[in-house]
């Protein structure tokens, strides 16, 4: 099946998209259980993403897996949906128990609490396969599966009993098999199902600009209108990535099915020419580099002033010439020969 079977304890909500690459594909399931979801809201929700696109959804109100894309609705049969629904209902029941266990372990008697899981895999054609299985409680890391060492990592003391229990119950073997076999098999199948949509490529339109205030030059790089969702936008200074100094706005969907994102970085006013924005996306044959160009001095007022001066001079010359002609004409009338007079001899 697509999602794993009923799970034990266990993840912090992580990015749905993987690193940008021409043939990278990702499958992610994010599962959330809440003690206090709010009026009219389901307390348990699972969503699935292929290449960053939401394709399935389950919640504790409907209690069924439902499609969120046309391609999965068209390709998956009823047996698939019945099987996924059975898994969703099993995970829902286990997370109801998990919320109670964690509240007792943390000595909590009430309040709003949340368990989050993220699990899935990435495949890069001709490259490595990566798998993830993590858990968080109340927004903090709780435990994660290390596929390399076949162990679970306890991020907090309260997670140690869970780590021991899972390792004694052979959970590492089960999750290794899921992440390397089952997950990859279903990801390839989903990519085949949705190849017409998932294979679409829209190049990002990139704009770089800067704004100086209080002695700091803030450089911004915005990529707009790209598809698929995975993208890497980073700032370079003298050719070196400045990841820790940059701030990202996240990847946000547009109304037309594409996405946009932006990344900013602060620099010294005189260092703007040392920075470049690098954009990596499946639609680009190679990473694009974009530089900030400082605005040129505004020549419009100068040109306008010169033009006004030229016009003024022209008007003055014209007026002066007219006055001169009129004055010269008046002098000429006093010396004209009278009509019919003979010339002097």
Curated annotation (Swiss-Prot):
Region listing for Alpha-1, in residue ranges: 23-110
UniProt keyword list: Disulfide bond, Glycoprotein, Immunity, Membrane, MHC I, Signal, Transmembrane, Transmembrane helix
Family indicated by similarity: Belongs to the MHC class I family.
Chain segments carrying region Connecting peptide: 293-301
Membrane-crossing residue ranges in chain numbering: 302-324
Gene3D superfamilies: Immunoglobulins, MHC class I-like antigen recognition-like
Keyword Transmembrane helix: yes
Sequence ranges on the Cytoplasmic membrane side: 325-345
Keyword hit for Transmembrane helix: yes
Positions of glycan attachment: 59, 107
Purpose: Involved in the presentation of foreign antigens to the immune system.
Organism annotation: Gallus gallus (Chicken)
Record GO biological process: antigen processing and presentation of peptide antigen via MHC class I; immune response
UniProt topology in membrane: Single-pass type I membrane protein
Taxonomic classification: Eukaryota, Metazoa, Chordata, Craniata, Vertebrata
Signal peptide coordinates: 1-22
Domain Ig-like C1-type span(s) in chain numbering: 204-293
Extracellular-facing ranges: 23-301
Protein name: Class I histocompatibility antigen, F10 alpha chain
GO cellular component: external side of plasma membrane; extracellular space; MHC class I protein complex
Subcellular location: Membrane
